[in-house]
């Protein structure tokens, strides 16, 4: 087993293990294609893409598992619950940005206050839009009724 799991870059003081899963080409390719790591995206587009994905899947648990799951208004309540969670996540992202980046908006990358504000704005718009699209899909497809 020691030939498979070894210290990262053969340095035992790094604190990271190099395993066949973490160092495989498929894993690196998959992680490299995620919007947070993809090259050439502005922070606004990163936030928009991440927000759309999160907003789209947030409505499901509130709709299926919420306290009003057996009522006719379960989908609408699930949408508003997802909106509430998105607002909470937006506040958390805003607080993180205010606490972490003190550069007064210099720079356009994600590690600056302006970039983080753009990321948060994109996340909010994308998540609200993604939840709305999921609502429209679930509301208009008779398979889910």
From Swiss-Prot:
Top-rank taxon, per record: Eukaryota
Keywords recorded for this protein, A-Z: Chloroplast, Membrane, Photosynthesis, Photosystem I, Plastid, Thylakoid, Transmembrane, Transmembrane helix
A single BP term in Gene Ontology: photosynthesis
Pfam families: PsaL
Compartments where found: Plastid, Chloroplast thylakoid membrane
InterPro entries: PSI_PsaL, PSI_PsaL_sf, PSI_suXI
Main location: plastid
Transmembrane segments: 48-68, 75-95, 125-145
Keyword Chloroplast set for record: yes
UniProt key word Plastid: yes
Listed Gene3D superfamilies: Photosystem I PsaL, reaction centre subunit XI
Classification via SUPFAM superfamilies: Photosystem I reaction center subunit XI, PsaL
GO CC annotation, single: photosystem I reaction center
UniProt membrane topology term: Multi-pass membrane protein
The family this protein is said to belong to: Belongs to the PsaL family.
The name this protein goes by in its record: Photosystem I reaction center subunit XI
Organism: Isochrysis galbana
High-level lineage: Eukaryota, Haptista, Haptophyta, Prymnesiophyceae, Isochrysidales
Gene name per UniProt: psaL
